Amino acid sequence: MSKTILITGATDGIGLETAKKLLQQGHTILAHGRNEEKLNKLTKELATTGKIETYLADLSSKDAVLYLAKEVAKNHSSINVLINNAAVLKTDVVTTDGLDVRFVVNTLAPYLLTKKLLPLLKDSGRVINVASAAQASVNFHALSGKAITLTDMEAYSQSKLALIMWSTTMSKI
């Protein structure tokens, strides 16, 4: 049975390879990316393989995450799978809202997108959060809000740990 699957970060790496494989299996892919040029290339490359739609959004912006959810809901009454794959490691450190970009994209955006799309996932929907073996134990000094600077890898590791923690909690609900 063909499924409708939203993949964030579908223009590169794991997201791209996942989109390719799922298209080959006959599923409809809703491919998200933050770069319009890469999304256009993706469409040209994969359009003959199967049904693919693209969605442009910068997941470091809360408004863009909400817009992505709204656009998906406008075009689909239901989806079967949400794959939260998009992530950043090395980037500008702070969003326009004053938040760490890595934490916003890697943790907060998947949470917010999942929350907004839950009504479309219905009873048998699935959420897959792509984490990392790079997650690390909590840096309580950083967590307390004291002014410290984390390396890119430390911040990435903390954001992936948070993703794993909320995924575990959500799986029990």
Q: What role is predicted for each listed range?
A:
Residues 114-115, 168:
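A short, exposed helix-loop element centered on a Lys and neighboring polar residues
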Residues 36-37, 55-70, 96:
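The beta1-alpha1 cofactor-binding region of Rossmann-like NAD(H)/NADP(H)-dependent oxidoreductases
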Residues 22:
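Aromatic pocket-lining residues of Rossmann-like dinucleotide-binding sites
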Residues 107-108:
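Ankyrin-repeat alpha-helix packing hotspot
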Residues 25-40:
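Conserved glycine-rich Rossmann-like NAD(P)H-binding loop of the short-chain dehydrogenase/reductase
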Residues 49-53, 71-84, 90-95:
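A glycine-rich helix->loop->beta "capping" turn
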